[in-house]
Amino acid sequence: GSGATPALMGICNDRFVVVTDGDAQMNVMLFWRDAIPQDWENIEGQTNPRVAGNALVTMDDANLTAIQSEQGVVVGGYGALVVNNDSPTIPDGYPAKAARLLVAYSGADPAFAPHGMQKFSWDPATRVFASDWVNQEVSSANGVPLVSLGSNTLYTVGGRDGKWALEGIDWTTGESVLTWITGSSRYNTVFAELFIDDEGHIMHGTAFGMVRYPVG
């Protein structure tokens, strides 16, 4: 198992369960969640027709050999996004099995802030699941991102110049559209999920309580 919570994607005839697998360099996988289409042919490298898509997470880095996310796949429409939760460095003598603690409690520190997110999409016309875009600049340290299809924006929290920040990314292009520097570790999400209230405020938990951002 990968530890990632399954997500549901799709409408009409193309409906899927989306997960990341347990490979060292994770893949994003789609599984038909209803009856498998009668004319469906197994994708390359797969013997199980239930698998509708299998895409390797590369972050556009040809030298990448390992990457993992501690979050479930973020789904919006036929798009599926994963983030990097691996610290870029581990101090000498620090136990590798505890590396997630660096991201959990020091995720804004430039030495430990993970960077990178990659979006994949299912094309109902060609029935192909493939990479859409990569953003290597933005950090999504440990929080669970949120996509708002109304604003076409993905929101997350991560490290920016050694401080915590709310980040907004265009869901279609992957370009950064918002950076709100919040500052100290009081704003560390500590693996909390982002959500939007009825008035459009973005909110998330921290170790010290809730954060609610103004609208506009």
Predicted regions and their residues:
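Conserved beta-strand position repeated once per blade in WD40 beta-propeller domains
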Residues: 3-8, 70-72, 143-146, 191-194
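Hydrophobic/aromatic beta-strand positions that recur at structurally equivalent sites within the blades
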Residues: 30-34, 120-122, 166-169, 211-216
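Loop/turn-rich, solvent-exposed surfaces of beta-rich toroidal or solenoidal domains
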Residues: 15-16, 68-180, 184-185
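Residue-level signal for well-ordered, solvent-exposed loop/turn and beta-edge residues enriched
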Residues: 7, 126-128, 173-175, 201, ...
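Structural signature of WD-repeat beta-propellers
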Residues: 23, 161, 205-207
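Long, internal scaffold/assembly segments composed of regular secondary structure
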Residues: 1-66
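Blade-level signature of beta-propeller repeat domains, shared across WD40, Kelch, NHL, RCC1
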Residues: 188-216
